[in-house]
Amino acid sequence: MTNIRKTHPLAKIINNSFIDLPAPSNISAWWNFGSLLGICLILQILTGLFLAMHYTSDTTTAFSSVTHICRDVNYGWIIRYMHANGASMFFICLFLHVGRGLYYGSYMFPETWNIGIILLFAVMATAFMGYVLPWGQMSFWGATVITNLLSAIPYIGTSLVEWIWGGFSVDKATLTRFFAFHFILPFIISALAAVHLLFLHETGSNNPSGIPSDSDKIPFHPYYTIKDILGALLLILALMMLVLFSPDLLGDPDNYTPANPLNTPPHIKPEWYFLFAYAILRSIPNKLGGVLALVLSILVLAIIPLLHTSKQRGMMFRPLSQCLFWLLVADLLTLTWIGGQPVEHPFITIGQLASILYFAILLIFMPAISIIENNLLKW
């Protein structure tokens, strides 16, 4: 009798995705982040569900309902902080996952890569709306500033912003709809992640060498299941260290002050994982230009496959490209730092230089260096 896991319609899908899946024998720990992102998503949905049971999406009670969760609900404080810091872990895994894709040429699977970019936008939108829900000072002013950016769109901008707000300012209608969207988006993300996996399994995983590995495959279980479990344990360890020892390390103290439309905080800034994009936005003195640069800072990833000029897939054997990649990482860290600084000298200039360098590396230097490397190897 054939094993039920290979014949049952539902079990067969799980089997072909997580058990009998042929995987390259040499994929490193950088390939762990896909499964870690899945764990983050499940964790966020579960903690979010329990928070939604006690949260009220009304401007008068939202802040006090979050306080109530932390003070009065059984283990509410740990659920709340796991959800808030879980978002940070989610983005750490996301950035490492995208970085891995850039380094090893995983963008050569165009469908998987493009769905990944859509996923990145969806997760960013979800995180932004989630940050608005506690209705603290930074929630309110963050929502006001970021939604206001849409008014830069010619002709329809102002109407679009008022339509999103549900009024003439960020108010009750805005909070209610943000809660609704924040609740539904993770399920859309789950569906997109399934499609992301579907396309990945059409081609099979890439590997560090960038060489096709069809001749040397091993089953996913037990080799990579055990490896993923180790990664998951380390992720949960890091998350719980953050939650239990310094839960407010990555948050903003301003968000412990209830939202006040009459009092603007001195420095409006988003959560740390948006600071790089925020720095790029602020580096352009024109409103529409800034918004375009903000969108392009992520959308630029979509044209990376078209700019691949190297004869090799990954950067494993390309030291010049490796130097450029790590320069890009340093540049993103610089942008993250600048995004959290006030708009004054010398931060403005540093931000502008770092923004130019970010686009220059991706659009000019990387393709150019790849051509030079091809010539050095006489290919």
UniProtKB/Swiss-Prot annotation:
Heme b b566 binds at residues 97, 196. Pfam families: Cytochrom_B_C, Cytochrome_B. Binds 2 heme b groups non-covalently. GO terms for molecular function: metal ion binding; ubiquinol-cytochrome-c reductase activity. GO terms for cellular component: mitochondrial inner membrane; respiratory chain complex III. Gene3D superfamilies: Cytochrome Bc1 Complex, Chain C (1.20.810.10). Component of the ubiquinol-cytochrome c reductase complex (complex III or cytochrome b-c1 complex) that is part of the mitochondrial respiratory chain. The b-c1 complex mediates electron transfer from ubiquinol to cytochrome c. Contributes to the generation of a proton gradient across the mitochondrial membrane that is then used for ATP synthesis. This is Cytochrome b. It comes from Martes foina (Beech marten).
